[in-house]
Regions:
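Conserved "right-hand" nucleotidyltransferase catalytic core of DNA-directed polymerases
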Residues: 1-85, 144, 152, 164, ...
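Nucleic-acid-processing active sites and adjacent nucleic-acid-binding tracks
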Residues: 33, 73-109
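A structural signal for short coil/turn segments at secondary-structure junctions
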Residues: 43-46, 102-105, 125
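Acidic beta-strand-to-loop metal/phosphate-binding motif
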Residues: 50, 106-114
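Metal-dependent phosphoesterase core characteristic of DEDDh/y 3'-5' exonuclease domains
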Residues: 71, 115-172, 202, 226
Length: 287
């Protein structure tokens, strides 16, 4: 889900470094057989693509998947409408082709905040194989000032992206992304996938230079599907052992409270009261 842009402050730029609107490259809507076949050929040829999802909610397992944007190279993007309330959405047969591309183990995939996007896709019967890079995680490893895709574009690419509010509004007048016209969604959604592709190339090089590429490849990326599954299915617990631990901790806390009250010399004191503790420690015990 795309995040709202940050308004540039004086510290973000200066008079000699002018921000420009995000370049609308070759951004297209892919909602027919010929377009989907073209995407399929391009992805197989490039053997990699960046992707982003457009949804109806920030909660991935409650969100409707409205569309997917894909980029196979800089300044390109394809928006695949899936569940807009009006307009021509992709057919089920073509959606199956897109799912097969995500499932293909030979094709590398890149995303920004893959945890969210993969959670949404998995909840819509996608299977994601060979996730290769996450620009949000890379930004964190590189100690970037912001982790937001739009802020990173502002900071690194000097490109200002469209705010989600420009499409869906805000407050009581806010609409769902499902109700955004497909034509208006294309440039917005494709810019996210395009930006992810551009940042991936930059961050991958930076991680390699400081020796953190293995951290991304061997630790961070393999953890994402594990975390997604945990968020979706939960984690099994042994309730008997947890109840036993809970009882042990409760008894230990009671013993500590009794010892503290004996030291204070007042069995009626409420140790959970910050006011009483403050009076005892500062005024009575001069600590």
């Amino acid at each position: 889900m795309s995040l709202i842009k940050r308004i540039p402050s004086k510290n973000d730029t200066d008079s000699n470094d002018r921000l420009i609107p995000f370049i609308n490259g070759e951004y297209r809507c892919a909602n027919n057989d010929s377009m989907i076949n073209l995407i399929e050929k391009l992805i197989i040829k490039k053997n990699s693509f960046s992707f982003d999802t457009e949804t109806s909610s920030l909660s991935p397992f409650e969100a409707d998947l409205v569309g997917i944007s894909i980029s196979t190279e800089k300044e390109t993007g394809w928006y695949i409408p899936i569940n807009h309330s009006s307009g021509n959405n992709i057919s089920e047969s073509n959606l199956t082709k897109i799912k097969q591309l995500f499932e293909n183990e030979e094709i590398k995939k890149f995303a920004h905040n893959a945890n969210y996007d993969i959670s949404v896709l998995v909840n819509n019967d996608f299977k994601i194989n060979n996730l290769n890079f996450d620009t949000l995680i890379a930004a964190n490893l590189l100690n970037k000032r912001s982790l937001s895709l739009k802020n990173l574009c502002l900071e690194i690419l000097r490109l200002q992206m469209t705010s989600i509010e420009e499409l869906i509004g805000k407050g009581k007048d806010q609409i769902s992304f499902k109700d955004v016209d497909i034509e208006k969604a294309v440039n917005y959604a494709c810019a996210d996938a395009d930006a992810t592709f551009r940042l991936k190339e930059i961050f991958e090089d930076e991680l390699s230079k400081i020796g953190l590429q293995d951290v991304m490849n061997k630790i961070e990326i393999p953890l994402i599907p594990v975390i997604v599954e945990m968020q979706k299915s939960g984690v099994s617990i042994n309730s008997q052992i947890l109840n036993k631990i809970s009882l042990e901790l409760k008894n230990e806390i009671s013993d500590l409270e009794l010892r503290a009250k004996n030291i204070i010399g007042n069995e009626e004191v409420n140790l959970r009261s910050s006011q009483q503790l403050s009076d005892i420690l500062i005024n009575q015990m001069n600590i």
